[in-house]
Every structure is written in C-alpha cells, then in structure tokens.
Curated annotation (Swiss-Prot):
Pathway given in the UniProt record: Pyrimidine metabolism; UMP biosynthesis via de novo pathway; (S)-dihydroorotate from bicarbonate: step 2/3
UniProt-annotated binding residues for carbamoyl phosphate: R66, T67, R116, H144, Q147, G272, P273
Record's keyword terms, sorted: Pyrimidine biosynthesis, Transferase
Annotated transmembrane regions: none
GO cellular component, one term: cytosol
Gene Ontology molecular functions: amino acid binding; aspartate carbamoyltransferase activity
Name by which UniProt lists this protein: Aspartate carbamoyltransferase catalytic subunit
Single biological process term from Gene Ontology: 'de novo' UMP biosynthetic process
Quaternary context: Heterododecamer (2C3:3R2) of six catalytic PyrB chains organized as two trimers (C3), and six regulatory PyrI chains organized as three dimers (R2).
E.C. no: 2.1.3.2
HAMAP family documented for this protein: Asp_carb_tr
Native organism: Bradyrhizobium sp. (strain BTAi1 / ATCC BAA-1182)
EC class: transferase
Catalyzed reactions per annotation: carbamoyl phosphate + L-aspartate = N-carbamoyl-L-aspartate + phosphate + H(+)
Amino acid sequence: MATSPKSTFVLGHRHLLGIEGLSAHDITGLLDLSEEYVELNRQVDKKRTVLRGRTQVNLFFEASTRTQSSFELAGKRLGADVMNMSVSSSSIKKGETLMDTAVTLNAMHPDILVVRHHASGAVELLARKVDGSVINAGDGAHEHPTQALLDALTIRRNKGRLEGLVIAICGDVLHSRVARSNILLLNTMGARVRVVAPSTLLPPGIERMGVEVARDMREGLNGADIVMMLRLQRERMNGSFVPSSSEYFQYFGLDQKKLAYAKPDALVMHPGPMNRGVEIDSIVADGAQSLIREQVEMGVAVRMAVLEALARNLPNA
C-alpha cells in the first residue's frame, strides 16, 4: 500500500460546488496535493486508504465518459466504495424530482456525492438536502471546478507558474462551464485571461469577469502562453450561433497557421471531447505543443486530491 500524503492541506469548505469562493490558498493547496497524486499514479501501487469505509456516489444526469470514469478511478484508488447511478434506469426517469432523489440518497448515508446536472445551480440545490460532501462535476453552463483545477495543474507543471501568463480561451464561451471556472481560477491566481470568440458565442457583459475580449484569432492569440480551445456545444444551442462547422473552423478553429499568432513556446489545451476539424485541427491536437493527453492524466490526480481534501472534513475523519 502506498505511503500517506505529505500535504496536510484541509479544504475549508464542506462541498466543492465551484471555483467561486475558493481563495488562492485553497487553489494552491489543492494543486500541491494533486502533485503528490500525479507521482502516486505513475507507480505500480496506486492505492491509498484515506477513503476506506467511505461511500462515494457518482450521480450523472448528463452523459459523461471522461469525468465520470476519472472520479470513479479516483475514488477506488483512495479505497472508497464507489457506486455509479444510471439516471436512464433510475426513478428520475419515472418522474422523481431532483429533491426527492437527494432525500432518497441521503437516507442511504453516502459520504461523498459527485453530481453532474444539465441545469445551472442544480448541484447546489441538491447539496442543501444531503449530509455528506458534494462535488460539482458540471452544472449546465455554470461551473466545472475540477476541470479548471486540472487545467491549472497542467499549466503549472509545464510553465512553472500561473501568475502573469497570458491565457487565451477560445470558442464557445457562451455555453461553457469550463470557461467560467477557468476564468475564475486564473484570475484568482494572477493570470491574464483573454476570451476569443464570435460575438454570438460571447456571454453579455463577459468583460465584467475581468477578461480581455477578442473577436478574431489573430488578435486573441497574440502573445498567448496558453491556447485553450473549447468544444462547440451544439446540444446547448437552440438557434443558429454559427453559420456552419466548416465556416467556424475557417475563422475560429485552431490550425498551425493560427497557432503561429501565439508565442513560439505556446501550449495547446482542450477539455475534451474534441470536435476535430471544427474547433481544432488534428495536426495541432496531436502535435508537440499539445497538452491534451496530459490533461486527462492530471484529471485523476486532481480528483483524488479533492476527494481527500473533503474527506478530511468528514465526521470521524
């Protein structure tokens, strides 16, 4: 069995519902603990026992492969009993409300619930009805805190810092919980954030979040240290936000020509899943400047760190 972590960081919150509300100290503590798990996950023995005897329920109202499997693996490596609830075959499909589901689950005394929901704010509502800790695995276009944390860890490991870096977040900012959480985190940590998108994919008043706004890639990528592409989320679109996928790629898809607008040592990120040929070219996605595969690796480490940090607040921990 692997040794205990050196970090003694305790997150001063019962839940992780978003990046909003986290201090720079909180974020740094989670990233430092995550670093330990990066190294652990590269060893033969990846097990720890910090969640032994604890129950983790993964409740996903939206389909997910990466995030759900990452949380499942994280919980199991920490020794938790992990249960994945299938919404498609549950009482929710039979008309049970979100609050009814929360009350029912709470009666089973889970220690940690990992929840994804299509409605912004739904995870926070559920958290009010349960006794255990709740982790927001994505709620509508609101927040996705563990994605922002894993992105920050990836950047810090490759650039050595977050403060002072120019981060260009490009694409469907309007519908992206990843963009919102990253903006909040990066601003807190002193990065310079720029969003790049057509006007139809920019939230009204986005400047009030403390970001620069560019409406073309040449301007947006100029001097960027990190180019973070976002998926075009057609499932959240009820109108015509872009003329066509091919035209969108022509102006806002990341190819080698547009990447050259950024710094020569700029690195490329994408939260996945990627629409190749829509928001990013395969040559760039699979190229030497891409951190996309590393982001997946960092995801497991970050989720292990979050689970452990919250578990330290649980009764009898």
